Amino acid sequence: MKCVEVYKELYHQEPFGIAFCPYRISPLGAHIDHQYGKINGLAIDKGIHMAYHPKQNGVVELQSLNFPKRAQFFVSAVPEEKQGDWADHLRGAAKMLGEKYRLKVGLSGIIEGSLPIGGLSSSASVIICFLSALCKVNGIHLEPMEMILTAKAAENQYVGVSCGKLDQSCEVLSKKNHLLYLDTKDDSYELIPTSEKMKPYKVAIFFSGLERSLKNSKYNLRQDECKAAAYALMGYAGMDYDTFANTRLRDVPVEVFEACLLYTSDAAD
């Protein structure tokens, strides 16, 4: 890990800890999780590593090997407004964790991603990796679902991405040689083991040459479009429905979908 090498060169000591969060792949889940659908996915052996040590003065100082500009802030006084850089994910994580727990200890170190940014949930991985280290130095233990929801809140409420919980769930709950099956409405999940009858396999991941960030994409617009569709379908069916913000495609019965598909098909003819 290059982050460990750089850490030793910079601080002239072994790191106090090395945090890791894997990237994820998802055969089924894009724009399904934020509509409270059922998804599946698995973690891979690539991800975010961070070599770090605690800082008793409560300051976070992190250098990324993937982005310019060092992150620096007090864990007890996170800026209310995002700054528009990669460290917003760290600030958001600290702010959400700090709303539930008293944070006194900061940390300093080096963070790196092992693959190009975008497409493998790198933003969620950064948040969870940082949260793991921040919890460690502050003596905080988060249960898996609490870690997932804290990381999700950091993206939703601070970074400004209206994501669901697909990425965080795959990264926290996945197990080697298993497929995660998750119902994002009630958070029930199952880890499905690889069948003994299944032939050995590998997952190929291709880099398109383009790097992206959800906060700079039309991701939030896509979610609003899904909500608008659900709102219209429920109104068409004469169903009782909640506010626009609390409407999801999961709330629409299958028979309503099928009836509307039949209607649109007839109209097209």
Report the location of each language-model feature.
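Single, functionally critical "micro-switch" positions that shape active/binding sites
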Residues: S122, L166, A268
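Conserved small/polar residues in nucleotide/adenosyl-binding loops
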Residues: Y263-D269
